[in-house]
């Protein structure tokens, strides 16, 4: 995207985690109505490209289009819509924006052909334990579509996602609380600060 090769994508909106990550990009999606102030905070913290969630599930219609425009104006590298987003909204986004429209795919029953026809430029595959299987099915029929996908919780699941054909893997970092727990446990034992 814009001459950048993106292989690792951090799934977080926590600015302290984002600032201390070496991922190639950030995907800023969250389970609430998207807000430009959150996008702004993430964009200011990140020194890498940011893909911004603009709704499609809880948030619908004209608001999604407005959030997409706003994200583009703020400098997002792409906008992400959730699986329930109608193809008509994907089409409107594609016509209105100059940045990639990334559509989340959660099941093999999703209308992949319709998504592409509407203007999806990248798929964000998030099918839990079936992610590698779904990637393979998409890749077989559409070998050239860029795919970012959830890597899962282990090195093995990440490797399976890559082997299935994902171009980039999203990774969920530990929370601040989890990191602090490890640090404080080490301090209580008078051990060195753990590395991350």
What is each model feature region?
Residues 86-122, 126-130:
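Histidine/lysine/aspartate-rich catalytic loop segments that bind and position anionic ligands
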Residues 1-50, 56-61, 73:
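Conserved N-terminal beta1-alpha1 strand-loop-helix module at the mouth
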Residues 22-23, 46-49, 75-77, 97-100, ...:
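Glycine-enriched alpha-helix->loop->beta-strand junction motifs that scaffold or abut catalytic
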Residues 74-86, 121-134, 164-185:
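Glycine-rich phosphate-binding active-site loops on the catalytic face of alpha/beta enzymes
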Residues 62-71, 110-118, 153-171:
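Catalytic cores of alpha/beta
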Residues 1-2, 25-28, 48-54, 79-81, ...:
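Hydrophobic faces of well-ordered beta-strands that scaffold small-molecule active sites
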């Amino acid at each position: 995207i814009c001459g950048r090769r993106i292989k690792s994508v951090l799934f977080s909106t926590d600015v302290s985690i984002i600032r201390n990550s070496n991922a190639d990009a950030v995907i800023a999606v969250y389970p609430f109505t998207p807000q430009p102030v959150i996008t702004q905070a993430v964009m200011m913290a990140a020194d890498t490209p940011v893909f911004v969630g603009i709704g499609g599930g809880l948030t619908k219609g004209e608001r999604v289009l407005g959030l997409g425009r706003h994200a583009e104006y703020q400098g997002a590298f792409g906008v992400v819509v959730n699986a329930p987003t109608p193809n008509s909204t994907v089409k409107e986004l594609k016509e209105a924006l100059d940045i990639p429209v990334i559509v989340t795919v959660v099941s093999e029953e999703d209308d992949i052909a319709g998504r592409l026809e509407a203007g999806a430029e990248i798929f964000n595959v998030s099918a839990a334990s079936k992610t590698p299987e779904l990637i393979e099915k998409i890749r077989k029929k559409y070998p050239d579509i860029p795919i970012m996908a959830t890597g899962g919780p282990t090195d093995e699941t990440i490797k399976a996602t890559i082997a299935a054909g994902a171009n980039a893997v999203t990774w969920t970092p530990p929370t601040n609380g989890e990191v602090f727990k490890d640090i404080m446990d080490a301090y209580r034992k008078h051990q060195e600060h753990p590395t991350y």
